[in-house]
Each structure stands twice: as structure tokens, then as C-alpha cells.
């Protein structure tokens, strides 16, 4: 019996081993193809580009097809968030491009073209008085999004004041001239006090950073600008490009797929001269390049996790110098009725669409 069992067992065992070897060889031959398919699935994303120069459009706001929910923003390569690709249609907003409604199901390739919308800033020559400060008149629109739902929107006209040798590029002071506020109370329902506080109205100039190539053209590589508070988990860098006469802010967030960059062109408020010309010789400044910052504050809680997105867009309307007497007079100005500047906000963009479902706050 033992002999018979041995004779029967050996052929079966050898047959199994032979089959396992064949299977192993097949797997090895298919492994590169399998890995290639997996990589393509993981990294294949739809890209948003400029219709003229085909360069990636960075930090474009992505909404669902109805424009009611914020999905996210495009990264430094212009790629859509992966969650957006799962939708049938999306709505895209960018301060320097025409709004676009895209049906992803009928998209022929993986590229979305946006049509540029430029706002020219004329060349201005100004003379500085003693102890004067640079005064910039701006139009600001600010939106907070609480867990993907627009919660508060404000529009403001303001003066920003910069001292000589301003190293950080932020305004030293500001004066709100007029403003309009809208709020959706339903967006706050069921949220924590912390999130409600973050989503409520705040200083619209808080994200204003202005720094051009003049102050940073002596730097090589990147300069760390600062680290935001722990919950935000963000680090800012300023990269300098002396060849193209520009620099860019890099924000590296713990909650982003990869760092995104905000390019800045032409303007510097450090080393102000007695007479200085803000020139367009390097090309017409695109206003969104001066300020179009988005920031995310994410709050962790015991049972739930929520977040608030803050989006600020700022348009430059005028630049001059203001003496001490003029600044004192500015501070005494009372709020005037808000009037939106003509030719800036396109009809049907995210602002006009969002405030339709909100209540005006006095």
C-alpha cells in the first residue's frame, strides 16, 4: 500500500509544481503590463490649460455641474481633483478666464481649454512726498465655504497703505471704503462653534501679499516666508526667477495633493524711490497674478472632521502716494453705499450665482 501511494503521489506532486512554475512565469510576463495599467489609472487626470499658450491653469476653482458645491482647485500642473473626474459635469471659475461648463462624459481627450479674460493695468508714474505711503485702491471679493457649501460672501472697496522698505509685502494698514455682505444661514446649521467662527466674516485684506522681483532678485533658490498655525499645516516659500523678472509664492499644505504656486509679476513695495514708474514693459500685468490666494483651514474634532475654505480675489483699481494728512482724512471717511466696479465681474460667475441664495447682511 505504501509503495502504491508513493508511486501515485510523486507524479501528482511533480505535475502541481510544474503548473505552479508555468503560472509564475505567466505572472512575471504580465507584471509590467499590470503595473503600467495601475500607474495610468492612478495618475491619469484631466488637465485645465490656457486656450492660447496651452500652459496649465493653476488654482482654478472647480464646482459641480450646478455650481452649488465646491469640489476643489486645480494643482500646479493644472490637473483636476480626482473627485471631480467622477462627476458627469463640472463648472470652472478662474479670475483671469471666462467661466466654463464642462460635460466630462463628452470630453474627447483629457484637456480642458479656458479662454483668457485679461484686465489691463495702465502704466502710472507717481511722485513721492516726504513721509508719504504708497496707497492702493482695490476691489476685493471674499468667500468662505463651509464643508463644500458657500457660507458667506463679501465685496469691498478699500485703500491699502504700504510703508517704505516694506519687507513682507503685506499692507501696513487698510481702510474699508464700502462693502456688501451676504450670508447663507443654512450652511452653518449643525456645525461646531469653531467652524462657524472661521466661516464668518473677517478682514477681507488678510490674504493680501504683494512682493515683486525688485526685492527678491538678489535671492538664489527659495526663501521660507513663514509657517501658518498648526491646524492649517501650511508653509510658504518665495521662489525667485531673475531671468523672467518674476517670483512666486509656493504654499505647501498638509491637506493638498502637492504644493501649488501663485505667480507674482512686476510690483515691489520695498525700496520705494522718490519717483517710480510701474511699467508694463515686461508685459501687461494680469491682475489675478497680483493677488488670487486660496487657503484652507481644517479643524479636527472627536467624532467628525470639518473644514473651511477661504477664497480672496483682489483687483487693483489705482496706485498713488498719500501724505499723512491725506491718510488721516481717509481714516475719517464713513462707509459709503457699495457699488461694484464695472467691467470686472463677469455676469454669471461664482459671485453673482452664489449670492442669489443668500441673505444680505447690513
Predicted segments, located by residue:
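A short, amphipathic beta-strand motif
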Residues: 46-52, 78-79, 112, 124
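Short, acidic Ser/Thr/Gly-rich low-complexity loop/linker segments typical of extracellular
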Residues: 68-79
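Bacterial Sec-dependent N-terminal signal peptides
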Residues: 1-47
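Short Pro-Gly-centered beta-turn/loop motif in secreted/extracellular proteins
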Residues: 80-88
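Hydrophobic beta-strand segments
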Residues: 60-64, 90, 126
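A short, solvent-exposed loop/turn motif at the edges and junctions
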Residues: 91-102
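Short, ordered, surface-exposed loop/turn motifs in non-cytosolic proteins
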Residues: 52-66
